[in-house]
């Protein structure tokens, strides 16, 4: 696949950033990505206004100060989710990730020849699949990035961490994953 020059430059920057941040502990990296989230909140006005509008619609009883606080926390969380995707392999080893109901999930996966669908929303759930990669192949649904190079890097890093990417709205890929023999 041919990438645009801008996609290549962004890819090189992200790889460089990953290498530099690898020198820091996971705890510090999470704080750094929270900062990236807050930076995005302030720099991307269109997204910020959309986020605030959505929160106002969801919580009409909240005042502007509370709405802004919720919006900023949302951006911090998104920053941490991006960090988790980039460093998934490290996040899921050496006891860094605790999976609630892991025994139940393992039983469902081990005692079933059919596909097992685990729905976790944005509760940090895709790390669980990565932790249990020795049982079967796990997939997580992700929205494709506009930058194809970044999208390919994120997919590669997730796979290295034991998690396979399923593009959002790709029915054929979903059907193929569901019908795959474990």
Where are these regions (language model features)?
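Short Gly/charged-rich anion-binding patches and loops
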Residues: 16, 50, 128, 153, ...
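Conserved Motif II region of HX4D acyltransferases
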Residues: 55, 114-118, 174-182
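Short low-complexity, flexible loop/linker segments enriched in glycine and/or proline
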Residues: 80, 156-157, 182
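Residue-level signal for alpha-helix termini/capping positions
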Residues: 109-110, 134, 178-179
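Membrane-proximal helical "anchor" segments flanking the first transmembrane region
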Residues: 1-117, 123-125
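Short, composition-biased local secondary-structure segments
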Residues: 21-24, 124-130, 177-182
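Catalytic core of membrane glycerolipid acyltransferases/transacylases, capturing the structured
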Residues: 114-169
